[in-house]
Amino acid sequence: MEIRFNPMKITGVGAFGDVRGRTAAGIRSVYFILCTGYYDGLSEDIRELDRKLSTDERCIYRRVTDLPVMGVREAAEYGEKWERLCRGESVIPTETEKALKEVCSIYRSLRKNINPTIEKNFAAVLMFYSDRLLGKMTCDSGKCPKLVCSGRIGLKEYLFFHMAALMGIDVMLLCPSGLPQLPEELERVYEHIRLGEC
């Protein structure tokens, strides 16, 4: 499946709730929005977005405020899963595998001189997040998957949400205190909306 990012201009939180990523002719339209700043009615607009998308039967909606913490047992389990994936075994859905490998490639290009253990640990965290947060959020379900994060975003977190967008999930990241430190080459993927002052 080919991904086309942000086919329509999104102007705010409410507009994200109104658009639906869709698939046509083998191309998936996906919205990946990064919002910075704050305005007086933002909290109310987020509550309204939650209400609207939670009750919309055409959507699979999830809002995240904190990413889960991976324990030692899970780290070993997902690390082994990554090693099996590298050997060519099919251990995760195809779209997830494709997105994971693309994001790991981005990570390698951004973090020079990483060794296989660091990459395995990074991939393990992404697979753990995916299992815990995305679950059945696929565009194969016939519904539009939408994910909103209103927590702290660093590079690792951003790359997880980037992976979700590559899987065909509409993603909106709310960063009221400002844009996280992201490399310039990632700017082509997301649309940045300034909601107000940081």
Regions found by a protein language model. Name each.
Residues 1-14, 23-126, 185-198:
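Conserved N-terminal ligand/cofactor-binding loop architecture of enzyme catalytic domains
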Residues 16-19, 45-48, 155-160:
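Short alpha-helical segments and helix-capping/turn motifs at coil-helix boundaries
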Residues 16-26, 133-141:
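Short boundary motifs at domain starts and secondary-structure transition points
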Residues 107-193:
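Active-site and donor-binding regions of nucleotide-sugar-utilizing enzymes
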